[in-house]
UniProtKB/Swiss-Prot annotation:
Residues 459-486, 542-591, 657-705 are extracellular. It comes from the Eukaryota. The modification Phosphoserine is found at residue 814. This is Short transient receptor potential channel 6. Lung and brain. One of its GO terms (cellular component) is plasma membrane. Its main location: membrane. It is a multi-pass membrane protein.
Length: 930
């Protein structure tokens, strides 16, 4: 009995083609398909069943030749199976059976793959094409889930790890889940194994060919999923126990790091970057950390530090650091109420001590300011929260006009002594709470500093129209008084200035104690304060030394009653000096040094006004631009000093032999060379500075050339370069002025959020009752700890003495103590074991303990962030990803329909055969009846 032939397509059309060539490839495949079918869609020639291929080899070769001919005629290249020019390896040539198998796996021919896996027992499922890809990799690359599931059921399947990486890179979630269900991932160790580690195990789990996988050797599945921002895949891998190990410190000298650095330093650096790319991925940050805000902030700072260390990868690390900062800003942007904003800014408040006076501690915001996450600090949600804290206990003042606020500031400045008295007497009263508010503290300190500047101005007011005493004159109040006693003594105005300076020194000491020396020196404004106060202190000390020496001389005169008029007697040298006019003083006189230092300190004091300028929207950006300009000037000074010193020494060497032989003293000494070249920058030096009175034209011409080159280099080149740098910095500030200003204002505000510094200078010198109470409480706590420590020490000594006595009398009689000791030892071991177990189960506490409020809020925010990221990704890939998926579905459906059609053809042929047999039997039955 004959059987209807079954039609099998060798290689069907695929819509998963190279970009831009999909239509042509489909047309060629459809053309070949119609060659095997008749006009009515039925097979022209009978084909043998599966597993019987030798008789069909000639037809296969003919079809392959025709396919290649058609493709060449269409003007495109097709990556054919078998040897190629670049990959000509005859030892791995494929049989017709293997080629058919790989074709079916690549183009989604599910029926062919299923039947070949079931019926072809000699089939090598790990056979590879000319590119070294096996059937599993081809099926995964073309998103054929059903074929992938069929192949994963086979034992000894190779390249499973590479197939997983490929599925992750393409974002095929269902295929990733199918591969993760493979027995190779049952223990989870494979998820933490990179291709390089797999090579050490000498297996083909990740093997691609002799050159390695298509992915980097140090990339694990979780790292690749994080790189590709595949949130669902990252979540799946994290549930399987996969984690990204943080790289060791850059300067780590452990054995592992030393070997990697010695073996291949470039590969070691790239592996670090790949790991940090995974750690800085928003997908990994949002799904792996219990506190993603804290993790992202610390990681951004770590990456910024690495950018300054590894200069060759600076751009990569900076990009990753900015990615972490953008992640934090994205979370803050998704907040919908004040509770969520406070959770991000404060962190886990339940595990931390509350802020001062019930004020939020803003621990995360402190970290953001420290790491200069400017967009986070300048975000409207953050600024609104800061503004509410800034006007604490003065909410009505927030909506007032600028005129009303100015009147409040003026009233505080005038009534500052009375407000300080109220706070001393009743620090916990309503007025005391208002004075502890950040805004009132800022106003009080600003008013105090303004008064200090006013004192500096008033101290010099008596000399505005010129001094009444010339430098060569002396003046005294009586005949027995030395002139220096009148000039070196401190006036009442200077005593007020000294009290302000002492108060500021005390405030800085408290700040150093609170912040620590490292944090204190990190702020540049603190360095300015330190320099200003140090110069003031040095000036006053020098002034006091001058007054002390003058007082000693005056005491000698006061002890001698015979000296009635100092102008009519001859004084000793040790006394006479202190009665001389100013022009006869020594250059190193303490009073002269004091006056010079005082002038510098006054300049620095007025420059300190720039600290409070960020509080104003108009002056804040200007102050920021000024600060950036100062930084540019310091950078410029390196090149400037190098060029300046070169010409200064050169011109000095040229003219140092002509002292007295020039029209002026320029360049004859190092000092004159410095003055001449410095003022030449501003066009204030004369050309005749290089002229010699004698006929030494060679030296003079060289001087002209060097002086001209100096002016061209300094004035035309370097100064214009400095102007360009300043202009560029100003433009950067101007382009992002709002963010820069809000960040600077937040730093200013934050300095007044901390506890303390309520009373401004100089009222802070008087200790308040609250400060005395806190001091007594701290002293009491310290004494209790000291006494408790002594008691514990006495108990330990007593136990030690008891044990020593037991050893003397023998241990046999103390079985109870031994049993107690053994029980204590067992209890200690149990405690150690339980503590170890608790540390290992730290990440599982969320399952056993109820989640805290902070965890609930972060969970909500992370959900919103992930959903928003998925929506953005889908909108970006709507034209590309969905189209590819549709193509693959159509391709698989096509083969299924062809298989169903072939099966229906067989059934129809069987029915026709049976019908023919019945029709042929009917005449015979009629004849037999007759």
């Amino acid at each position: 009995m004959s059987q209807s032939p079954r039609f099998v397509t060798r290689r069907g059309g695929s819509l998963k083609a190279a970009p831009g060539a999909g239509t042509r490839r489909n047309e060629s495949q459809d053309y070949l398909l119609m060659d095997e079918l008749g006009d009515d869609g039925y097979p022209q020639l009978p084909l043998p069943p599966y597993g019987y291929y030798p008789s069909f080899r000639g037809n296969e070769n003919r079809l392959t030749h025709r396919r290649q001919t058609i493709l060449r005629e269409k003007g495109r290249r097709l990556a054919n199976r078998g040897p190629a020019y670049m990959f000509n390896d005859h030892s791995t040539s494929l049989s017709i059976e293997e080629e058919r198998f790989l074709d079916a796996a690549e183009y989604g021919n599910i029926p062919v793959v299923r039947k070949m896996l079931e019926e072809c027992h000699s089939l090598n499922v790990n056979c590879v094409d000319y590119m070294g890809q096996n059937a599993l990799q081809l099926a995964v690359a073309n998103e054929h889930l059903e074929i992938t599931e069929l192949l994963l059921k086979k034992e000894n399947l190779s390249r499973v790890g590479d197939a997983l990486l490929l599925a992750i890179s393409k974002g095929y979630v269902r295929i990733v889940e199918a591969i993760l269900n493979h027995p190779a991932f049952a223990e989870g160790k494979r998820l933490a194994t990179s291709p390089s580690q797999s090579e050490l195990q000498q297996d083909d789990f990740y093997a691609y060919d002799e050159d390695g996988t298509r992915f980097s050797h140090d990339v694990t599945p979780i790292i690749l999923a994080a790189h590709c921002q595949e949130y669902e895949i990252v979540h799946t891998l994290l549930r399987k126990g996969a984690r990204i190990e943080r790289p060791h410190d850059y300067f780590c000298k452990c054995t592992e790091c030393s070997q990697k650095q010695k073996h291949d330093s470039f590969s070691h650096s790239r592996s670090r970057i790949n790991a940090y790319k995974g750690l800085a991925s928003p997908a990994y940050l949002s799904l792996s950390s219990e506190d993603p805000v804290m993790t992202a902030l610390e990681l951004s700072n770590e990456l910024a530090v690495l950018a300054n260390i590894e200069k060759e990868f600076k751009n990569d690390y900076r990009k990753l650091s900015m990615q972490c900062k953008d992640f934090v800003v994205g979370l803050l942007d998704l907040c919908r109420n004040t509770e969520e904003v406070e959770a991000i800014l404060n962190g886990d408040a339940e595990t931390r001590q509350p802020g001062d006076f019930g004020r939020p501690n803003l621990s995360r915001l402190k970290l953001a300011i420290k790491y200069e996450v400017k967009k986070f600090v300048a975000h409207p949600n953050c600024q609104q929260q800061l503004l509410s804290i800034w006007y604490e206990n003065l909410s009505g003042l927030r909506q007032q006009t600028m005129a009303v606020k100015f009147l409040v500031v003026l009233a505080v400045a005038i009534g500052l002594p009375f407000l300080a008295l109220i706070y001393w007497c009743a620090p916990c009263s309503k007025m005391g709470k208002i004075l502890r508010g950040p805004f009132m503290k800022f106003v009080a300190h600003a008013a105090s500093f303004t008064i200090f500047l006013g004192l500096l101005v008033m101290n010099a007011a008596d000399r505005f129209e010129g001094t009444k005493l010339l430098p060569n004159e002396t003046s005294t109040d009586n005949a027995r008084q030395l002139f220096r006693m009148k000039t070196s003594c401190f006036s009442w105005m200077e005593m007020l200035i000294i009290s302000w300076v002492i108060g500021m020194i005390w405030a800085e000491c408290k700040e150093i104690w609170t912040q620590g020396p490292k944090e204190y020196l990190f702020e540049l404004w603190n360095m300015l304060d330190f320099g200003m106060l140090a110069i003031f202190a040095a000036s006053f000390i020098a002034r006091f030394m001058a007054f002390w020496h003058a007082s000693k001389a005056q005491s000698i005169i006061d002890a001698n009653d015979t000296l009635k008029d100092l102008t009519k007697v001859t004084l000793g040298d040790n006394v006479k000096y202190y009665n001389l006019a100013r022009i006869k003083w020594d250059p190193t006189d303490p009073q002269i040094i004091s006056e010079g230092l005082y002038a510098i300190a006054v300049v620095l004091s007025f420059s300190r006004i720039a600290y409070i300028l960020p509080a104003n929207e108009s002056f804040g950006p200007l102050q920021i631009s000024l600060g950036r300009t100062v930084k540019d000037i310091f950078k410029f000074m390196v090149i400037f000093i190098m060029v300046f010193v070169a010409f200064m020494i050169g011109m000095f060497n040229l003219y140092s032999y002509y002292i007295g032989a020039k029209q002026n003293e320029a360049f004859t000494t190092v000092e004159e060379s410095f003055k001449t070249l410095f003022w030449a920058i501003f066009g204030l030096s004369e050309v005749k500075s290089v002229v010699i009175n004698y006929n030494h034209k060679f030296i003079e011409n060289i001087g002209y050339v060097l002086y001209g080159v100096y002016n061209v280099t300094m004035v035309i080149v370097l100064l214009n370069m400095l102007i360009a740098m300043i202009n560029s910095s100003f433009q950067e500030i101007e382009d992002d002025a709002d963010v820069e200003w809000k960040f600077a204002r937040a730093k200013l505000w934050f300095s007044y959020f901390e506890e303390g510094r309520t009373l401004p200078v100089p009222f802070n010198l008087v200790p308040s009752p609250k400060s005395l109470l806190y001091l007594l409480l701290k002293f009491k706590k310290w004494m209790c700890e000291l006494i408790q420590g002594q008691k514990q020490g006495f108990q330990e000594d007593a136990e030690m003495n008891k044990r020593n006595e037991e050893k003397k009398f023998g241990i046999s009689g103390s079985h109870e103590d031994l049993s107690k000791f053994s029980l204590d030892k067992n209890q200690l071991a149990h405690n150690k074991q339980s503590s170890t177990r608790s540390s290992e189960d730290y990440h599982l506490n969320s399952f056993s303990n109820p989640p805290r409020q902070y965890q609930k809020i972060m969970k909500r925010l992370i959900k919103r962030y992930v959903l928003q990221a998925q929506i953005d990704k889908e909108s970006d890939e709507v034209n590309e990803g969905e189209l590819k998926e549709i193509k693959q579905d159509i391709s698989s459906l096509r083969y299924e329909l062809l298989e169903e059609k072939s099966q229906n053809t067989e059934d129809l042929a069987e029915l026709i055969r049976k019908l023919g047999e019945r029709l042929s039997l009917e005449p015979k039955l009629e004849e037999s009846r007759r």
